[in-house]
Amino acid sequence: MTDAERSQEANGIWLCRTCHKKVDDDPNSFSAELLFEWKQSHTRKIADGLGKTDAGFRERADRERLKGFEASSSLARQIVLDKPLFWEYNLTAELLRSGFAHIKFKYEALKQGFYALPVARIDSDDFADWADVQMRNIVNQIEAIKLAGTVGLLEAWGPPGQPGQERDILQITQFIIDAAEHLLKTEEVVRFLKPPSHFEKVQELYIGIAGRQLEELFKIPDWIISKTSDENLAPGDHILKLVFDMPDGWVEQVIKAYNEAVDSA
């Protein structure tokens, strides 16, 4: 949980002075996930102890509202239950943040060479088609992300002044997370290819292209939180511009490297 998220009133948990100090002094032992799990467990225990009909109804209603969110983080589930101000955006940010976490970790590990996959060989005659497929894979995922992140999320958030649909937000964010997974897989395919030696320079130019798009995608959750945090909240439109592109001169370099490879074959 970021500092901006901690500062939001909706994320508050009532603690006694002693417990409050323990949590503040040792945040590693008392993670946000642990505290929210405690809060939900405490709520269930109180409801059971009271034994009131309305408490039982509320618990069943909460379980119904959380259907589909069983695998989501504790914070995401709490947002669904509490529906604080701007909950639609905070839920989106938390689902993406938690969904991106393992992808981001694995991508960083890939760049540092912490793991490797079996190498695939390819013949010269198939290299052009292979390169075209990798680029199409990247473009297709970016197009899907653009539509999901604009049309899909705007519909899921609901019209101005009306509440959004939490299950629609869950589904759309999962589409974006899936696209990030596919981009990571494309990056792995490119890195663990063994082309004929004269095509190695072309392959090197493809390394990092899918990852470049991933790094742009990872900016989304923190940006949303920064705009909805209590201290940064401001009226008006907020627009995040993500740039999915290639390095300057990349296309020309690929064409040149490919032509040189063909001439030397």
Residue ranges of each PLM-predicted region?
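Histidine-centered nuclease catalytic patch
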Residues: 1-12, 23-40
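The −1 position to Zn-ligating cysteines in a subset of zinc-ribbon hairpins
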Residues: 15
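Short, cysteine/histidine-rich loop/knuckle motifs that typically chelate Zn2+
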Residues: 18
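A broad, low-amplitude sensor of folded, mature protein cores
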Residues: 21, 26, 62, 99-100
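Charged/polar positions within long, soluble alpha-helices
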Residues: 21-24, 47, 54, 263
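A short, terminal or domain-edge coil/loop segment
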Residues: 21-24, 29, 82-89
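Domain-exit/linker segments immediately C-terminal to small folded modules
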Residues: 32-86
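Long, low-complexity, intrinsically disordered terminal regions
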Residues: 64-265
